[in-house]
Amino acid sequence: MCSIMGYCDCCAAFSDFEEGFKKTVSRGPDDSRIIDTGKGLLGFHRLAIMGLTPDGMQPFELDGSYVVCNGEIYGYEKIKEELLKKYTFKSGSDCEILLPLYREYGTDMFKMLDAEFALIIYDGEEKKYIAARDPIGIRPLYYGYDKKGVIMFASEAKNLVGMCGHVMPFPPGHYYKDGEFVQYCDIAAVDEVCHDDLETVCKNIREKLIAGVDKRLVADAKVGFLLSGGLDSSLVCAIAARQSKKPIRTFAIGMSEDAIDLKYAKEVADYIGSDHTEVIMTKEQVIDSLEGVIRMLGTFDITTIRASMGMYLLCKWIHENTDIRVLLTGEISDELFGYKYTDFAPSAEEFQKESQKRIRELHMYDVLRADRCISVNSLEARVPFGDLDFVKYVMSVDPAKKMNTYGKGKYLLRHAFEGDYLPHDILFREKAAFSDAVGHSMVDYLKEYAEGLYTEDEFKEKCEKYTHAKPFTKESLLYREIFEKYYPGQSEMIVDFWMPNKSWEGCDVNDPSARVLSNYGESGK
């Protein structure tokens, strides 16, 4: 991960910009630079992953134009080969192709990128700024306006709090130019429904996911894998292990009392022959880390915070004890193939609508969690299930095939990898809520801690002062109060609490955990 920031007009207060930008130096601890473009400021904190030499340091410059980009551009070598006919390059960085690409294609370039990215371009010829974000929002970007009405962009909301009145997430799949946000890609939209037979669909799913993992193994820095023992991360690890000439490094975490995941993660690690590490977390670590995790995340969402506790502590351990710089994770599978609660979808049409909603909101929930937990520990997250070709294909598959009519959720994904990729019991293991999987006790400790902080009268009184996404439990109130401490008045960055679709029968619940659903069954065992 890297961190970027831009002030898009002259007369910027350099010291204020620098102070705001320092808040995300952990995203890019290798080098930092702020430049004056003549009409504003651009900042870059570098975490070197591709092109590790100083020549790969940003901003990149081309005839008075500049770019800063937090991104990974897959297959950039082919684009670079074509651009070499007209341009010279000084580094091995994938992001150096961006300015030549912009000169050749303008904002049409964004449709051409197979990438996860957030970028800011200063067009020196037109004296204006362009910003853009990848179609899913895997790389973070926020914007706001200062007192003079000047727009600012930054990798995280914390960079802009205090400098801008109202901070909002930059919409994924959009670019900003001439005061307008323009959508260049709606990754959740379906151009044409795919009616291939089951075996063809599963063959395509298998091939496209393998390709998505493959391209994310390319790095000049060392790569590791988060392995929960659940279906999604286990598949990523199994695919990578087949592609690697030496054992991959896998990491799992769980509570000391009742970690469900650790035994399954070890079973997978033994099966694929990985160099595996288990990290144990305690009640004290969870409670002591809570405020820092919420400050890091920039959210009050219950499930995002719960699921971040283990991920943050695991990534912290990896940062402090290894030389790994890149981590592959299993996010974005549920949004595509279904959660436990989508078993209750009343129709294929409703299943598809819910999937589209979840994909379009990913940048506020699971993707945000993975980015912050990993990047705050000076690591880079890569998400194979977020591969654009893979997502586009799965979204196009007839939703009737994706619904759970097989007696097992996410059947297409499971069936696609039947064979010897994973042990059968792992491949067909019931999904466990992540907060359950690291240990039932973790969520119980968080709830217990919150319960002890407020009387019933205090709880009711404190909840009343919030109008947007009003807290409804003592746990949610605690998270909101910590959020407001660091992001005062910025709650609209998050549209609402992540919850199952309450309009569906069986889903009208008041806790985001799948544990409260009637179909959870054996999932948490």
Where are these regions (language model features)?
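ATP-dependent adenylate-handling active sites, centered on carboxylate activation for C-N bond formation
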Residues: 8-14, 85, 104, 125-130, ...
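Acidic-aromatic/histidine active-site loop/patch
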Residues: 98
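Conserved S-adenosyl-L-methionine
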Residues: 184-185, 423-432
